Amino acid sequence: MTIKNINADLEERLNEIKDDVINHMNKDHAEANLTYVRALAGMPDATSARITDFDQFRVSLTAETLNGSSNVQVQFLEPLEKSEDIRPALIKLLKHARTRG
């Protein structure tokens, strides 16, 4: 199996869980999303944030401020190697964000 095949397989597995992860994070962890954009995306005045997408390298969010919304991306500290890595990667990213914010 080539690197390209491995990445395609991971992308497929991430797509299978993507909706559930995004819905869960936006419903149950809105404060974590806000911490990501405030501390790691350079938007300290953000009032809310929601995840819109993710891949093995980054999470994409829409951040709201009093001046409107912005789409931002925050890199994971390490690329995901398997779909099961998403939860620990988001937790690790949150812990990192808290040390920066």
Language model regions located:
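Binding-site signature for planar aromatic cofactors or substrates
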Residues: 1-101
